[in-house]
Amino acid sequence: MAKEIILGIDLGTTNSCVAVIENKKPIVLENPEGKRTVPSVVSFNGDEVLVGDAAKRKQITNPNTISSIKRLMGTKEKVTVLNKDYTPEEISAKILTYIKEYAEKKIGAKVNKAVITVPAYFDDAQRQATKNAGIIAGLSVERIINEPTAAALAYGIDKLDKEQKILVFDLGGGTFDVSVLDMADGTFEVLSTSGDNHLGGDDWDQVIINWLLKSIADEFNIDLSKNKMAMQRLKDAAEKAKIELSGINTTTISLPFIAMDSSGQPINFEKELNRATFDNLTKNLIERLKKPVLDAMKESKLSLVDIDQVLMVGGSTRMPAVQNLVKELTGKEPNHSLNPDEVVAIGAAIQGGVLAGEIDDILLLDVTPLTLSIETMGGVATPLIPRNTKIPVSKSQIFSTAADNQPSVDIRIVQGERSLAADNKLLGNFELSGIEPAPRGVPQIEIKFNIDANGIMSVNAKDLKTQKETSITIKDSQGLSQDEIDKMIKEAEENKEKDAKVKHERELVNRADSLINQLEQVSKTENVPQEQKDVFNKQIEDLTNARDAQDYVKLEAEVKKVEDLLTNAAKFAQQAQQQNPDNQNNNKDDVTEATVTDDSTKK
């Protein structure tokens, strides 16, 4: 393991991933469930907070579950959960804390440094918010880098001697980014970026969900859109179907006991979805992928024939229709030799390795995603740092007063591509006072913009005659103070052990309640032998006693024992259904059983 450990974290909208450098090579760290990515989902239940896969299973059934919080980063919006307000930074920090803790267990050492990636289109406020989330989680964020840039690092680590023009096509769960890079002599230079902050694999899932809802409504005359349990199963089935259609031409979506009809009979739904239908349903989404690619190429001043490689990033790039579009647009076979779900975290880890001195001969040149300007006379946005300027960067320009004997100037900093300041995003403003009386246009005011390697900007204004100056560091638009950040860190640390204990106990009770309910349902099934029912009833009694006595050691043992029985119970139910496919009354009690069995297999 490297002497100084710096985590590389892909903090994604839908999923996150973490990697580190070991023996000068990046490795992806598995989460506690043995998976190499973790859902970016946080679920609250009283004092219990779940993160990752456990939270994702509650995404629809528990209204106090937060997902896609990344979309709110850098805004003033807060989410209210159980009568408490949380900032996007606090929710993101819970995800980062979870990642940090399981990474430390895998590494076997404490870690307090990280490189975190963000979409190329994240503005200054969103980048600062991401950094704040890391601080709250107990991480020193050594660098914020663009996701496509990190991907290029990952793909380019073994190709440092080849000069190439690269197009990075990054379609994740919630965002779409395109970057054009020039790679030569160990240097990555970002020539242009483009994208869509509200387009990702989740949109393809939603199309299938809508198709399923309509199919069920047409066949059974029932609307399941307000049925939380059914919607959770539809969401899971849609994602599974999308993934399967990347490898096969037809998949069968089977949803037994999805709901009850108006007469109280269970609804068993099954339907085939083929790739051609799926592609037709999502053709408008495919169409939306074209413009950002063409915009990025135009901005880079290159033609598509100049591109040497197209790098595929994000799990959604596995879809054949997406790959076909890339071939159609670029005339190149896309490179997906690395796992698209992991490549960004790998690149972040490589950047961490560079900062820690473990990897040499790589220089990362990132760019500003939008033009940075100040408002001048007439409300005009006068650019100081154009879009796609390499960072870190420092630029200055001399301005003057707009009126005679003007004693002060108000400096307003905006971000965007519009000509008028009012049409762009106001990042901040401050005043330089004490200017000596003089005719308009005579005083010389130097305005200096400085952007560090993380994309965080500071602005300085100086009267060159009096040498009076003032400055501002652009904070996120929500304006978290250092006191607020410190308070969040303190609260997280003070409640760390308590939260872990409560979480474990609540998980046990929830699992026990679910198992008790399932065994009770199976016991009512006529096809289950009486001796098996007696075993189930004894287990129900043991689970109930341990739960009510709050004997969590015993409860954990009983839960593990019953989960083995649960597998057999599911087999009994399946056999009963196969033997009596038309006997709806006999299967009525299986509605709960089927649902609980699906949940338990995920635990």
Curated annotation (Swiss-Prot):
Domain of life: Bacteria
Compositional bias segments (type: Polar residues): 594-603
Gene Ontology MF term list: ATP binding; ATP-dependent protein folding chaperone; unfolded protein binding
InterPro entries the UniProt entry points to: ATPase_NBD, Chaperone_DnaK, Heat_shock_70_CS, HSP70_peptide-bd_sf, Hsp_70_fam
Inducing factors: By stress conditions e.g. heat shock.
Region feature Disordered, mapped onto this chain: 573-603
Coiled coil: none
Database matches in PROSITE patterns: HSP70_1, HSP70_2
Keyword Chaperone: yes
Biased composition (Low complexity): 573-586
Keywords, in A-Z order: ATP-binding, Chaperone, Nucleotide-binding, Phosphoprotein, Stress response
Phosphothreonine modified-residue sites: T175
Stored HAMAP family: DnaK
NCBIfam families reported in the protein's UniProt record: PRK00290.1, prok_dnaK
Family membership noted in the UniProt record: Belongs to the heat shock protein 70 family.
Function summary: Acts as a chaperone.
Protein name per Swiss-Prot or TrEMBL: Chaperone protein DnaK
Annotated gene: dnaK
